From Swiss-Prot:
Top-level taxon in the UniProt lineage: Bacteria
Entries under NCBIfam families matching the protein: mutS1 (TIGR01070), PRK05399.1 (NF003810)
Any GO BP annotation: mismatch repair
GO MF annotations, alphabetized: ATP binding; ATP-dependent DNA damage sensor activity; damaged DNA binding; mismatched DNA binding
Entries under CDD domains matching the protein: ABC_MutS1
Keyword annotations from UniProtKB, A to Z: ATP-binding, DNA damage, DNA repair, DNA-binding, Nucleotide-binding
Family, as annotated: Belongs to the DNA mismatch repair MutS family.
Consequence recorded when altering residue 840 to K: In strain: BB270V15
Species per Swiss-Prot/TrEMBL record: Staphylococcus aureus
Record Pfam families: MutS_I, MutS_II, MutS_III, MutS_IV, MutS_V
Effect upon mutating residue 706 to P: In strain: BB399V12
Name recorded for this polypeptide: DNA mismatch repair protein MutS
Gene: mutS
Function as written in the Swiss-Prot or TrEMBL entry: This protein is involved in the repair of mismatches in DNA. It is possible that it carries out the mismatch recognition step. This protein has a weak ATPase activity.
Length: 872
């Protein structure tokens, strides 16, 4: 340490306190990084890695970025999973003797990005925390950029994981008692999550909720936010308590399979329900829309209230179009207010805020001309005329980005500032006159008077004009020599420079002080501005619903008291938009208390999956309070939607297609109620034909007998179509197709009854498989049909009315029968191998403690998979 310079000693001391961060260490106009930080940053940022003290025996790796463009570099690092500690100079080096004091003023983390370019305008940037006291769990989350703060509680980890996927945080804060297994599950739920520990026990004020655990979760979150941000965060709102059961529940797989906010193939917004429905005009409205898609309502009263407003906007096209024009002039009030409180707002931000609030009276007057009984928001809109006057009288219309370079305030706003500006202006007029005079006096027409921050004002003469020029004759004193010019000063110029720069410096310093005062004045309006932002964002969403309803010919849904679902000429809204509207084939669907299962057959590519998805998406849109793509729509209010669509291995957790399929089916069969919707697409295809067929039939029977959930079940197991004889609640439907001269023509029309052919070879032909393969497949198919008949006899299996009790005696019998094929020695060795170490003894204990009488077959399969993974 004795060989290290004082500046590097200071760096190492600060770095030791922030070892989990990349330290941006301010040196003049640059943020410098050293040692391993420099190696990491240079690699990620693709900037040059250099060396400090390069001539010494052990030079220090270093790299740097300009402070004025640091935000983009910080964003890149944070997006790559790094935390960045910003260490600033706390003193002016010009006025400090010795070492400049430096401190970390902020830590930028994935969940606390505040810079304008660092977060997507249409996405929330959530940071989340949770605490556990089994069986209770409390969860709190916050968007630091907007001030939103919410908390909830529940009693199971499944709801925890579902909430995390719904919120989709960029950062999770946990305490030390969270198990490694749960951490792994959280990391598998979303790719963007990072798990971080709280760093302080300091308590910050928060309105304590009645629930102690929720209070702890909120405190854990706020503690971490204050530790990293190290500044006033008064824009963070009072915590709002909510309950997950107040919204339709959809897990990660349901949202992914239905492509609500992200497409499966492209991982983008395009081609999703969010993409279709986003006709919002403000960033706040776009974020609100995504929240509404993630959390459809289950309160009929709240849904109808939204629909009434959509009705009103739909009936007033001209007013809606005018409203869209007004909204288009409204900037992101939520995040502007956040930056005001945070202290990183600039004058241009405040001009945007001024323009935004100037539209509130226009919006209020427009809504007053419509049905005020429906548009209850009109009474909550508050024209902020006093704040508007403050901003209008103070700032120029086009201020610079920096608040420390002057040029922010209007003439007449502050008398002292006007005097400084006048002195500076007069001085510059004098400089122009001096330049003209010196050109005439010296005869050098290219002579010019210039300025830079190092040398101040100077007279510059090109080298070509210096041959017969004697500077001393004109009172010129040499200041700097360049390759093509000389720079001079005079006593007169130096004297005037002090006056001009003194006035400019004083003006800039005063302007910054005035701006800070203005910022603090605007901060007083934080709560009122946030309330206006909330109202405007909701109005923006509802006008967007009306816009797409008019554009795509949607209709208002109604909700049945008897839990009937009846859709007349329904369409898939996203597929319809991608296609030509006139080419889309609409379909009907009716499910009620007597017939609540559709068994759907038909060829591949005929539209079975699209049909099932559109029923689910229409239900979601309706419970958001939006019109739906139907001629008529009567719906129940669903509490949950479960889906199993598509075939995909879960490579991260090592689960096969079939295992993923069974896990998703298990959730639906375990948690579905008569108020739920289940979408099962070709269950059982990941295993052998008879296993898959047996499981599919068992699941259909289970739904029919147990949950009575509305269910759409597509299948290629045509043997299942005879189930309608035993299950009155099941109805066979099919997606029609015709074969004409060996070619398959998809009609995409859902009709009553079953089909007994999947047209697999015809679909393969459409995919341009080699003709030799097609011909051989036809021969093999003919042989199968001739020898076995088209249908397997499994469809005639009698339904099991009462399952036999599974007990230890039956289990032992099964084991004894199995060992008939093994020698006793082999069996004993196998048993010894299974339980030969401590880990496997634990597995033995788990098996012994299983309550087999109360386990369903799928639960047993899931448990077996867990045990298998422990043995790997």
């Amino acid at each position: 340490m004795s060989n290290v310079t004082p500046m590097m000693q200071q760096y190492l001391k600060i770095k030791s306190e922030y070892q989990d961060c990349l330290l941006f260490f301010r040196l003049g106009d640059f943020y410098e990084m050293f040692y391993e930080d420099a190696k990491e940053a240079s690699r990620v940022l693709e900037i040059t890695l250099t060396k400090r003290d390069a001539k010494k025996e052990n030079p220090i790796p270093m790299c740097g970025v300009p402070y004025h463009s640091a935000d983009s570099y910080i964003d890149t690092l944070v997006n790559n999973g790094y935390k960045v500690a910003i260490c600033e100079q706390m003193e002016d080096p010009k006025q400090t003797k010795g070492m400049v004091r430096r401190e970390v003023v902020r830590i930028v983390t994935p969940g606390t990005v505040m810079e304008q370019g660092g977060v997507d305008d249409k996405q929330n940037n959530y940071i989340l925390s949770f605490v556990m006291n089994q069986p209770e769990i409390a969860l709190s989350y916050c968007d630091v950029s907007t001030g939103e703060l919410k908390v909830t509680h529940f009693n199971d980890e499944a709801t925890l994981l579902n909430e995390i996927t719904t919120i989709n945080p960029n950062e999770v804060v946990i305490n030390d008692n969270i198990s490694d297994n749960l951490k792994r599950q959280i990391n598998m739920v979303t790719e963007t999550i990072t798990v971080r520990e709280t760093l302080s026990s300091e308590i910050y004020s928060v309105n304590q909720t009645e629930h102690k655990l929720m209070y702890q979760a909120t405190q854990l979150l706020l503690d971490y936010i204050h530790h990293t941000q190290k500044r006033d965060l008064s824009h963070i709102e009072d915590v709002v308590q909510y309950a997950a059961i107040d919204y339709m529940k959809m897990d990660f797989y349901a949202k992914r399979n239905l492509e609500l906010t992200e497409s499966i193939r492209l991982k983008s917004k395009k081609g999703t329900l969010l993409w279709l429905m986003d006709e919002t005009k403000t960033p706040m409205g776009a974020r609100r829309l995504k929240q509404w898609i993630d959390r459809p309502l289950i309160s009929k009263e709240q849904i109808e209230a939204r629909l009434d407003i959509v009705d009103e906007f739909s009936a007033h096209f001209i007013e809606r179009d005018t409203l869209r024009t007004y909204l288009n002039q409204v900037y992101d009030i939520e995040r502007l207010v956040g930056r005001v409180s945070y202290g990183n707002v600039n004058a241009r931000d405040l001009i945007q805020l001024k323009h935004s609030i100037s539209e509130i009276p226009n919006i209020k007057a427009l809504l007053n001309s419509m049905n005020q009984n429906t548009l209850v928001q009109v009474n909550q809109l508050e024209p902020l005329d006093d704040l508007l006057d403050i901003l209008e009288q103070s700032l120029v219309e086009e201020p610079p980005i920096s608040v420390k370079d002057g040029g922010l305030f209007k003439v007449g706003f502050n008398t002292q500032l006007d005097e400084y500006l006048e002195a500076s202006k007069n001085g510059k007029t004098w400089l122009a006159e001096l330049q003209a005079k010196e050109r005439q006096r010296t005869g050098i027409k290219s002579l010019k008077i210039s300025f830079n921050k190092v040398f101040g004002y100077f007279i510059e003469i090109t080298r070509a004009n210096l041959q017969n020029f004697e500077p001393s004759e004109f009172g010129y004193m040499r200041k700097q020599t360049l390759s093509n010019a000389e720079r001079f000063i005079t006593d007169e110029l130096k004297e005037k420079e002090d006056i001009i720069l003194g006035a400019e410096d004083k003006a800039i310093e005063l302007e910054y002080q005035l701006f800070v005062q203005l910022r603090e004045e605007v901060k007083k309006y934080t709560e009122r501005l946030q309330q206006q932002a909330k109202i405007i964002s909701e109005l923006d969403c509802l006008q967007s619903f009306a816009e797409i309803a008019q554009k795509y010919n949607y209709t208002r849904p109604s909700f049945s008291e008897n839990k009937t679902l009846e859709l007349v000429e329904s369409r898939h809204p996203v597929v319809e938009r991608v296609m030509d509207y006139n080419d889309y084939v609409p379909n009907n669907c009716r499910l009620d208390n007597e017939t609540f299962i559709y068994l759907i057959t038909g060829p591949n590519m005929s539209g079975k999956s699209t049909y099932m998805r559109q029923v689910a998406i229409i239900s979601i849109m309706a419970q958001m309070g939006a019109y739906v793509p139907c001629k008529e729509a009567v719906l129940p209010i669903f509490d949950q939607i479960f889906t199993r669509i598509g075939a995909a291995d879960d490579l991260v957790s090592g689960k096969s297609t079939f295992m993923v399929e069974m896990l998703e089916a298990q959730k639906a069969l375990t948690y579905a109620t008569e108020d739920s919707l289940i979408i099962f697409d070709e269950i059982g295809r990941g295993t052998s034909t008879y296993d898959g067929l047996a499981l599919a039939q068992a699941m259909i029977e289970y739904v029919a007998e147990t949950s009575h959930a509305k269910t759409l079940f597509s299948t290629h197991y045509h043997e299942l179509t005879t189930l309608d004889q035993a299950l009155p609640s099941l109805k066979n439907v099919h997606v029609a197709a015709n074969e004409y001269k060996g070619e398959l023509i998809f009609l995409h029309k859902v009709k009553d009854g079953a089909v007994d052919d999947s047209y697999g070879i015809q679909v393969a032909k459409l995919a341009d498989l080699p003709e030799k393969v097609i011909s051989r497949a036809q021969v093999i198919l003919s042989e199968f049909e001739a020898s076995a008949g088209k249908k397997s006899s499994i469809s005639n299996l009698k339904m099991v009315e009462n399952e036999p009790e599974i007990n230890q005696e039956n289990l032992n019998l099964s084991v004894e029968e199995t060992t008939d094929t093994l020698s006793q020695k082999d069996f004993e060795q196998a048993s010894f191998d299974l339980f030969e170490n401590d880990q496997e003894s634990e597995i033995e204990l788990q098996i012994k403690n299983l309550n087999l009488s109360n386990m369903t077959p799928i639960e047993a399969l899931v448990k077996l998979s867990e045990l298998q993974n422990q043995l790997k």
